[in-house]
Design a protein with these regions (language model features):
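Charged docking surfaces used in two-component/phosphorelay signaling
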Residues: 12-20
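Short hydrophobic/Thr-rich beta-strand motif most characteristic of the beta2 strand and flanking loop
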Residues: 22-29, 37
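Active-site beta3 strand of CheY-like receiver
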Residues: 41-47
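Receiver (REC) domain active-site loop signature in two-component systems and cognate sites
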Residues: 52, 75
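Short, glycine/charged-rich "phosphate-handling" switch motifs in NTP-dependent
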Residues: 96
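C-terminal output helix
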Residues: 103-113
Length: 124
């Protein structure tokens, strides 16, 4: 499990909640850090903030999907942007789920549990 968010408070909130649910969690501060860590960590699921410096979530998710070594990793985009065109963009990239901030930690945990070990399919 890899949690990617430039906001330390949100990153730690997600990581702590997932750790309490039994997930082994690694964190990254932005998209570039995510791409550096993903090959060595081989996570099953990545929670990925959209708005980040250096490399945003859109570009990071696209690069994950284009790389055969990371294309099968489940990706949950998390964003304050709740417009349908943002969700559509996520579907076009091939992310597995899209959560909007503020999100219910229980919902995030449910989504991550469903995706852990599930085949890669764009969210509904």
């Amino acid at each position: 499990m890899l949690v990617v968010d430039d906001d330390e408070i949100i990153r730690q909130l997600i990581a702590v909640n997932l750790t309490l649910e039994g997930f082994e969690v690694l964190t990254a501060v932005d998209g570039r850090d995510c791409l550096d860590k993903v090959t060595e960590a081989s996570p099953d699921v990545i929670t990925l903030d959209v708005m980040m410096p250096r490399l945003d979530g859109w570009v990071t998710a696209t690069q994950l999907r284009k790389n055969p070594e990371t294309a099968g990793i489940r990706v949950v985009l998390i964003s304050a942007r709740a417009q349908e065109d943002d969700r559509a963009r996520g579907r076009d990239i091939g992310v597995d789920a899209y959560l909007t901030k503020p999100f219910d930690p229980a919902e995030m945990i449910r989504v991550v549990r469903e995706l852990a070990g599930a085949p890669n399919t764009a969210f509904d």
